Structures are given as C-alpha cells and as structure tokens.
Amino acid sequence: MKKWFSSISKKKVSFSTLLLLGSGIVLSSCSNIDKPNVFRTLSQQSVENKVDYSKLPKENKTVRNLVFGTAEYNDGNYVLVVTTETDSSQINFLNGSNNQAVSTENWAGDLGTTVKQVQNRYSTYPKGVKFLIWNDIDPNPVKWNPFARYPVIASDNELAKQTDKDNSDKLRRNDESAIQYREIVTFIQTVYSGSVNNLINQSNVHAQTVGTDVTKAIVIAFRKNNLDQISAHFYNPDNSNGSNAPGSNQPNQDSGNNGSTTPAAPAAAAAKKSYSAGSFGVKRHAVQVSINFLNFLDSVYTPLN
C-alpha cells in the first residue's frame, strides 16, 4: 500500500483523480458513456434553418471525453447541453414553448436564440465556441421524464389494482432514449457531484402529471486557457442571478483530457455583464429569455464587445 501511494505521489496525480479512483469512476464503463457519435452539433446555420434534432450532425468524441472536458474538440472551448423534451421548463429552453407537441426543429427557445447571438462573438478563440447537444425524445404518445416512476402502492392495498401494485415505484420508461439519458445524467452527477446537486427534483419523481419538471437542463461550458487548462462552468436556467454552480476556480492542467482521468475543475461564478434588449434588434421578450444565458456565456468566454 505504501509503495502504491508513493508511486501515485511521484506522478503528481491530482486529489480529484484520487477521489475518482476511490469512487470507481475511472474503472467503470457504461454502455453509452464510452460510445462516440452520441452528442450532436448545434450550429447557427442549423438553428436558422430549423434543422430537426435527429438530423443534426453527430460528434465522434465519446460522452466520457466530452463530459470530462477535452481539447480534442474545438480546442476545448464548447458548450455541452443535455435535455429532455418531457419537462415543461426544458421544452421552453429548447423551443420557447411549454407544449410537448412543439418539436425542437424550431429552436425558438433560450438555447437557439443564444446560439445565433454568439456567432463570431468570442473572437479571441480562433475556432470560436461550439455547442453540442444530446436530447431525450420519448417515442411514446404520453411523454414521461426518463427518471419518472410509477406511484408507490402498498402490496396490501386492497383498493389498488394488481397492475398498479406490480408497477409500484418502477421507472415509467425503459426505451433506448430513456436509458441513454439516465446513463449520461448519472455520469455527470458522479463526475461533478456538488456542482449538480439539485439536478433531479426527487419530490416530482412520482408525479402523475405529464410535463412535471423532474430534471433540469444540463448546460456545461468548457473553456481552455493559455496554460492548456480546461475548466467546467455550470449554467442554471432557473437562477439567472447565480448561473455558475459552486466549485473550485482552479482548473486542471490537462491538455484536453488526452489519456487523463481527471475531469475539468468546476469554476466559480464570474461577474455578469448586462445588456439592453434594444442591443440585439429582436423582440424584447425573446431577448429577455436569452439574455441570462448570454450573460452566463460572457462570464465564461471573452465577448467581442
């Protein structure tokens, strides 16, 4: 054991890596986490042309590398988005509507309007800032969140139907999209722990109303500085005044996670910039929806003006 710790110290492995080793993250492998071609690229052109999510081009980097933060994609400067078209707030973030019937092909929500606004905005980055998205779409007519469960029914409840007893506390969905969503969300929770503490609203897991917010949209902005350090910044769509999740502001010196098992360090919130609605020449309510997201991105990346 002493020899093992001695070898670890000589290699200067970070404390966060030791935590990952202890939790088994480095050694674990979910079926979807190490797959390439899972996330899709969302560009300004795709938003303007209202390209359907299923037709967006796929990125060949694995979920694991993208979640850890990698310079192999766009030199480490990208925004990772994970959503589900089952919760009203996330539908609004994608489409600007709370209606499940509205498809992401319109991209009229906070995400799409901001993607259009940041085109060429961060000129200090040679390749700019790119957006990657993975979106859960329930193939069933009644669309439930992947973490939604059936109500808890006591086995000795004489008034309950047997089917309700059999389904008690079971997951409502086990389709491919739901399984993939749960794996990705759980992996992000495990890697970044405290930065995504309130991602799942446990009080709504057993809700019987379709569209109830069970999870939040996950938005992680990765940035590489001139020391080849990549840091992870978390956006909270429900809290415009405190968009970045708490965490260390000391990024890891990691040239893109090439062979590294250390995820990008969560970064502390930076001061927000404010902009007037008239600055963008679009409808006031649309700008008001996206301005918080733009402020968040400006706190991570250097704006053009």
Curated annotation (Swiss-Prot):
Keyword Membrane attributed: yes
Compartmental location: Cell membrane
Origin superkingdom: Bacteria
Pfam family, one: DUF6856
Disulfide bonds: none
Lipid attachment in record (N-palmitoyl cysteine): C30
Signal sequence coordinates: 1-29
InterPro entries: DUF6856
GO cellular component, one term: plasma membrane
Name of the molecule in the record: Uncharacterized lipoprotein MG348 homolog
Lipid attachment site numbers (S-diacylglycerol cysteine): C30
Disordered: annotated segments: 234-265
Keywords assigned: Cell membrane, Lipoprotein, Membrane, Palmitate, Signal
Polar residues bias spans: 237-258
